[in-house]
Amino acid sequence: SGFGNWIRIKHDDGTITVYGHMATLDVKVGDRVTSGQKIAGMGSLGFSTGSHLHFEVHPNGGDAVDPKPWLAERGIQL
């Protein structure tokens, strides 16, 4: 994958979030995670030009949407 180390989380409502280019992974397949839990360390693995987080939101497991309004709908302001 172009993301290098990456994590995919399936949320209880069916939404999938994807986190890419991670330097370290602190969870493994099948782990149940909680809000605020550290899941990885940011990095620059894969096709990347510098350390950053690649973040995607796929409501109901469908196509990716712009995460900013999706987060805002849930009370999270960037």
PLM region spans:
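Catalytic cores of peptidoglycan-degrading enzymes
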Residues: 1-78
